[in-house]
Amino acid sequence: MIKAKKKIKKYKGIIFDLDGTLLDTIEDLTDSVNDVMQLYHFPQHDTKKCKMMVGNGFRKLITRALPEERQKDEQFVDEVLAQFAKAYHKRYLNKTVPYEGILQMVNELHKNGIQTAVNSNKRSDYTEALVNKFFAQTPMVAVYGERESKGIPKKPDPAAALEIADKMKLSSAEILYIGDSETDMKTGQNAGMDTIGVAWGFRGAEELKANHATYIAENPEDILKYIL
């Protein structure tokens, strides 16, 4: 009897974005932004608009949320950013949840020997706190948030992704980069990695297609089907 050949896994590691990919954080972010907008008597923003503001760190989020005539006042941005940090600290676990099917998907990846990591432009303390809260049972090779103060540039610079590849002891060709935005697709591409764009995230499939995602996943199960 001829035995069927065992499927060879091309990918042995995955790097995930956090907000809009693993976790739905938009309501807590929007509420925190609006707390600060209200404090300064500026117009409020809905979640749809906030989805287009996030992805490049808290400072960019706050700058984009401010009225245009105040966006270039760096000292004022610093002041508002400090207020946002206080508001988000109170709210960041209020409504944030993993997307449906995410926990099961990550667990299944680990059962199949796939290494995982998180690479986010979110502040490092919140990135680590959220991963510890929702993925405590899942070993991550690395959990990286924004580290510019340590000389590591933010996404889409590939520095953090390549650092994770070294930790995984894998080549870029063996790693998939998964996220929900142009920033994530460019990060993966800049690191020489194939990319999966998740259509359930903050930006949607059209932005992911326009930025040449290797594959578009409509749900977490699609990721498992693509990889395993």
Q: Can you say where each PLM-predicted feature lies in the sequence?
A:
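N-terminal helical cap/lid subdomain that shapes the substrate entry/recognition surface
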Residues: I2, K7-L18, L22-Q104, K111, ...
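Glycine-rich phosphate-binding loop signature in dinucleotide/nucleotide-binding domains
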Residues: I8-K9, N112-I114, M168-E174
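Substrate-recognition "cap/lid" segment bordering the active-site pocket of phosphatases
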Residues: N94-K95, R123-L176, E182-A191, A205-E206
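Surface-exposed amphipathic alpha-helices with a cationic face
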Residues: L103-H110, M185-N190
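Substrate-recognition element of Asp-dependent hydrolases with the DxDx(T/V) motif
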Residues: M105-N132
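Short, glycine/polar-rich helix-capping loops at beta-to-alpha or helix-loop-helix junctions
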Residues: W200-K209
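Short acidic-hydrophobic, aromatic-tinged amphipathic segments that line or gate anion-handling sites
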Residues: Y215-N219
